[in-house]
């Protein structure tokens, strides 16, 4: 196999046209085989095989800077840069990350995980190169979905006018950008992606400049050319050229030789260039072609049938979606908003049943929050379902366009806490919502509590409300005490464990472990984590002087620190308080079980914290 001989990008550059085509076929087989075992982002990687190979044929990623937007399409890049043999550990604890990580390889220029930032990052690198007098090329790869994020246009607007040599590759796999129409347009696009065309342009301008009326002739011909482009080329081309980019494309993203030639021309252009590439998500694997969304992020599956090996388990996301549908039937003011994550957040069925009350704003969380504020202001009840780590992108709007006016917007915040295999960029471990004035934050620990809390948040409460819940399903606790702000689940006199959300079951198990050692541990569950119920917490902790606060959040500003301040202010007489949290840095990837154990947030870790507080 040719793939087995590829240990660095230098090996890719040496291949013949036939060998390169074979390599692409082998890479697709490799991707399907490996991801079927570990799970991961398959469809997007199948779509960029030829593009990634072409990038490595033209650029040297050991010195050049390759910035991948979102980053989940990095598998081919990793396979070609000396990490092929690590794929058995893909997205596993201590293994190969599913996203670019500079600590993994010199070929990973920048950590990625969220959308729309690649052009801004690439421009920063290009400007640093110029100011420091360095010599390297900068390439950003961004998808048409990420292009819908406002940050991408901020970056494009600045980059196009900067004059900095850099290449932006627009990976258009969603057909959301206007297509070129007609034979003449196709021929013109073909000409514009030919390196000889750009060499001719340089010679043409130099020749005209030698004539007495040369500058005038050049300006006239430039105006004629611009008018023709606007008539014959897809409108998207003129958008980028108006920003200051040289536009090359559209290019067949599965033609390695054509891609190589175009990228070489872009590399030599000496100015901002946008290369528009058409790819097909899931290319080369029929099941992913038919259901690209299913195979966007997929668990282990049978490659022969495309069936996921473990499917059908009920999740918090599913329960949220079903509950919101019921609430929408009861109240016509209820609307649902998502940011390009309808399936992931459990809103697919809602969209089918209530198409006029469902709004997918694309990868634009800030816009989603601000729009929800406008809807609430006019009397609707908007529910914005969004992943915790993605909602961070709309923080300013949470304050300015929602909280300051005390608007009744409900945030259904999915993937809170430790999320597992996607690692640092996807954990929901920043307790930023509790810092927002007037925000109520609820934390269900079971499906029953999610149903009850969501109903209260939508139909009974006022002002901004966030309901935070984890990825996946229940952890063994299936109680329903969500109507109280604080609940004592287990009585004890020696120490108290204060926790909330998905860690509730771990706290109960810890209390059981300690009981076997003769230690009486009280378990206090917080259902409302912001604002904290001072009186309720003090009553729940009455008589206990040693306390452990356990939460799957970064320590700074989270419940543990706020609980500590509350007890001090109330003069509760606490003798010792141990904060058991994620700590000060976001953890890498791994299963939830593995990460909890490593962080001391499983039953044994919490029990050990109680032993320490009693020592």
Where are these regions (language model features)?
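N-terminal amphipathic, basic-rich helices that act as targeting or association modules
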Residues: 1-80, 241-245, 252-256, 273-276
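A glycine-rich helix N-cap at a beta->alpha junction
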Residues: 86-96, 161-175, 196, 403-415
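Structural signature of the thiamine diphosphate
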Residues: 218-287, 408-413, 430-479, 603-615
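Long, well-ordered, tryptophan-enriched scaffold segments
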Residues: 14, 173-320
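Peripheral docking tails and interdomain loops at the edges
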Residues: 301-303, 308-312, 420-422, 440-441, ...
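Glycine-/acidic-rich phosphate or pyrophosphate-binding loops and their flanking alpha/beta elements
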Residues: 234, 261-264, 296-297, 315-330, ...
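Cofactor-binding active-site loop characterized by glycine-rich and histidine/acidic residues
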Residues: 41-162, 316, 333-334, 338-339, ...
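Non-catalytic terminal/interface segments that mediate subunit docking, oligomerization
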Residues: 65, 271, 279-391, 397-407, ...
């Amino acid at each position: 196999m040719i793939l087995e001989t590829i240990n660095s990008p230098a090996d890719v550059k040496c291949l013949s046209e036939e060998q390169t085509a074979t390599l692409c076929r082998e890479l697709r087989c490799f991707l399907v085989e490996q991801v079927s075992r570990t799970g991961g982002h398959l469809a997007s990687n199948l779509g960029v095989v030829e593009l990634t190979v072409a990038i490595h044929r033209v650029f040297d990623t050991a010195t050049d800077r390759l910035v991948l937007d979102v980053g989940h399409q990095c598998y081919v890049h990793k396979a070609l840069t000396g990490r092929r043999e690590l794929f058995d550990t893909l997205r596993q604890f201590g293994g190969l990350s599913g996203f670019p990580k500079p600590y993994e390889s010199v070929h990973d220029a920048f950590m990625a995980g969220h959308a729309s930032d690649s052009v801004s990052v690439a421009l920063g690198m290009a400007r640093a190169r110029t100011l420091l007098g360095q010599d390297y090329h900068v390439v950003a790869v961004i998808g048409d979905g990420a292009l819908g994020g406002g940050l991408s246009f901020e970056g494009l607007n600045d980059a196009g006018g900067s004059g900095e040599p850099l290449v932006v590759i627009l990976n258009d796999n969603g057909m959301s950008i206007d297509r070129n129409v007609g034979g003449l347009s196709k021929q013109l696009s073909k000409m514009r992606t030919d390196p000889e065309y750009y060499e001719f342009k340089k010679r043409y301008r130099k020749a005209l400049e030698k004539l007495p009326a040369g500058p005038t002739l050049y300006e006239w011909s430039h105006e004629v050319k611009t008018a023709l482009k606007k008539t014959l080329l897809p409108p998207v081309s003129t958008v980028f050229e108006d920003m200051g980019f040289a536009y090359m494309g559209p290019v067949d993203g599965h033609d390695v030789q054509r891609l190589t030639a175009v990228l070489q021309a872009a590399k030599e252009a000496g100015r901002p260039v946008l290369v528009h590439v058409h790819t097909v998500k899931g290319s080369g694997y029929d099941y992913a072609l038919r259901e690209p969304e299913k195979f966007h992020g997929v668990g282990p599956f049978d490659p022969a049938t495309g069936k996921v090996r473990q499917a059908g388990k009920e999740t918090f996301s599913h329960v949220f979606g079903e509950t919101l549908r019921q609430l929408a039937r009861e109240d016509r003011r209820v609307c649902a908003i998502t940011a390009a994550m309808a399936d992931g957040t459990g809103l697919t069925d809602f969209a089918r049943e209530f198409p006029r009350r469902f709004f997918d704003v694309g990868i634009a969380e800030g816009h989603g929050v601000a729009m929800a504020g406008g809807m609430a202001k006019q009397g609707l009840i908007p529910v914005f379902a969004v992943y915790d780590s993605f909602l961070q992108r709309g923080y300013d709007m949470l304050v300015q366009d929602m909280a300051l006016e005390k608007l009744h917007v409900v945030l259904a915040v999915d993937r809170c806490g430790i999320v597992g295999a996607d690692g640092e960029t996807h954990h929901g471990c920043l307790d930023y919502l509790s810092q927002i004035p007037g925000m109520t934050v609820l934390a269900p620990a079971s499906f029953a509590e999610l149903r009850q809390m969501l109903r209260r948040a939508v139909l009974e409460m006022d002002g901004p409300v966030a309901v935070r819940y984890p990825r996946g399903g229940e952890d063994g606790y299936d109680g329903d005490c969500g109507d109280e702000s604080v609940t004592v689940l287990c009585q004890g006199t020696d120490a108290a464990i204060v926790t909330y959300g998905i860690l509730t079951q771990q706290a109960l198990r810890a209390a059981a472990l300690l009981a076997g050692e003769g230690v009486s541990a009280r378990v206090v569950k917080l259902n409302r984590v912001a604002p904290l119920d001072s009186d309720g917490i003090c009553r729940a902790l009455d008589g206990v002087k040693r306390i452990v606060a356990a939460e799957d959040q970064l320590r700074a500003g989270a419940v543990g620190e706020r609980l500590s301040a509350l007890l001090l202010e109330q003069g509760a007489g606490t003798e010792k308080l141990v904060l058991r949290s994620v700590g000060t840095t976001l953890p890498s990837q791994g299963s939830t079980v593995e990460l909890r154990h490593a962080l001391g947030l499983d039953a044994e870790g919490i029990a050990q914290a109680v032993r320490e507080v009693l020592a």
